[in-house]
Amino acid sequence: MIWYRRNAAVTTIVDGAASSATAAGSMAGNVAETVVSGAGTVASSVLQPLGFDPLRWLQGGTDADEIDDAERLWVAVDGMGGDHAPGPILEGCLDAIDRLPLKIRFVGEIDRVMAAATSLGLREALESARAAGHLDLVASGPSIGMDDEATAVRRKRDASINVAMDLVKKGEAEAVYSAGNSGAVMASAIFRLGRLKGIDRPAIGALFPTKDPGKPVLVLDVGANMDCKPTYLHQFALLGNIYSRDVLQVKRPRIGLLNIGEEECKGNDLSLKTHELLRDESRLHFAGNCEGRDVLSGDFDVVVCDGFTGNVLLKFLESVGSVLLGVLRAELPRGRRGKVGSAFLRSNLKRIKKRLDHAEHGGALLLGVNGISVIGHGSSKALSVVSALRIAHSAASHGVMEDLATLQQGCD
């Protein structure tokens, strides 16, 4: 299953960079090889009881009757973005309104949205949310398809993702969410919201579970930038440090550089030069190189890498949950003994699935633009939408943008 679809055109739009990923591909192969051992450690740890888990906390919810309307934040939603939009996106938004202190500005083609609401039996819930002032429908033009080039954001100025970004720019929403074409989402965010001063390239940051239930790791970049300079990775570390500190409540995030060895002398030219920058950065707690097997170890709070390597890692980890469950089921004895064993393990298996299922984590933040932007999976269903909206709400309510603004000091 593909989490983030990226058009190569977005790199051309933003910086005119040429694509040359040969060295990154070699490094990605080493990373994928070593991360397998880390996955085994996670497999054994997920059977342990859960303590405080930011991922679990992000996945939780609140009864609608307990939510004070004064606490609700406006989030703009690209209702036409995604493989299955607008139906599952609308369903997830209505569910999120009942569970989270937020209000939705749902952007899309009104006729298609209303038709989807009717076909899914959501018409009454939709009208109720509108009457309560918890959901607004905002009209847009034709959407940008999942297979369109990122340049479409310039041709289709009234596309749903552009309209949603404009709501954030005008202060009518505090965050934006889209499960659409990630290249187009990134391009729209850059053109509409602009980059933070001092940040050359925005990065997509995704949360991965680790063997410690209370310590997810933020990995960035996982697909926005195929070719990186050392300064880009240095900036990714600064962005990730603030997110980890503000949203995940890590007092002193441990920053790791994804590499093929722990020693300072290991890696390609990008790794060696980035290591020097991170080592000398006083604003960071640089914990050194992070091998692939250590990404899920819980020893790092933030791991930085180029988008090519990060996306390879991301796609590999997508398969871990289903593979582990398949292995466990295959190893259970058949017959009566197997049924008894399955009964005892049922709750554990459900917990494993929940912790490793990408749908439970919803989406990833696009860090480095002048606004909170969350990119969801192209295949997002209602559960993924709720989880992604929770991430957007958490980032907005924890003052992430205020702290990110401090990175701009001295950049005028």
Where are these regions (language model features)?
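Composition-driven recognition of long, low-complexity, acid-poor segments enriched in small hydrophobic
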Residues: 6-47
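Glycine-rich phosphate-binding loop
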Residues: 28, 167-186, 266, 271-353
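N-terminal phosphate-binding or glycine-rich loops at protein starts, especially the Walker A/P-loop
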Residues: 28, 49-115
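Short, glycine-rich nucleotide/cofactor-binding loops
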Residues: 74-87, 224-234, 375-382
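Glycine-rich phosphate/diphosphate-binding loop of Rossmann-like nucleotide-binding domains
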Residues: 86-88, 100-105, 226-292, 301, ...
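Phosphate/nucleotide-donor binding subsite
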Residues: 124-173
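Glycine-rich phosphate/nucleotide-binding loop
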Residues: 190-219, 299-303, 307-412
